[in-house]
Each structure stands twice: as structure tokens, then as C-alpha cells.
From Swiss-Prot:
Protein name: Large ribosomal subunit protein bL17
GO biological process: translation
Family: Belongs to the bacterial ribosomal protein bL17 family.
Disulfide bond recorded as keyword: no
Organism expressing this protein natively: Geobacillus kaustophilus (strain HTA426)
Record gene name: rplQ
Amino acid sequence: MSYRKLGRTTSQRKALLRDLATDLIINERIETTEARAKELRSVMEKMITLGKRGDLHARRQAAAFIRKEVANSETGQDALQKLFSDIAPRYQDRQGGYTRIMKLGPRRGDGAPMVIIELV
């Protein structure tokens, strides 16, 4: 299985992808580097597929990965609840391809290629 190391140790890489996945669930659109977005795409495919399954085991598997952050302060809904109640039903008839990556220009400081990744 090949993956991008993203210049980090295994635990740092997992933490980065957890943070990015949680942010993408909450905001539904984030700006990041191209390499991070391409790795995040496969993680989000798995999370949304778990959300579509919707059983207790899938919810626990997703809860083990997604951070416990508040997605909507008015309703008190957290990221996991948003994934299972709002995002997953949207893609019930779609077999994969839940995210879109749009290229931006290079980052000003170091020239890293930047993209916007969003839920379709």
C-alpha cells in the first residue's frame, strides 16, 4: 500500500489527517497543500462510507478517528453527528467520489502547490 509520508512520523501524519478530516466535515471546504488534499481524499472516502453504513460499529469506528469538535454551536452538534446525520445521507445514492480538489496557485512563502478540497 503506497501513501505520502508528508515529511512526518507516523503518529504526526495520523494526527494531521485526523485534524484535516474533522475540519473538512465541519467546514465542508478547506484550503491545503496538494499532497495533503490527495491523502485526505482517501480518508474522507472511508469516513463517508462509514457514515452511509450508519450502524453502531461504523459509528464507533468513525468516532475513533474523528476529533470531538463542535460543528454547530447553535445546536451543539459535533463533527461525528454531522457526518452521520447531514453529510452521509447526501451521498446515499453515490458510489464514491465524494470530494473535489480544485487547484489554486502556489503558496507565497515556499511555493507549495495549494488546492481547495471540498465535499461535492
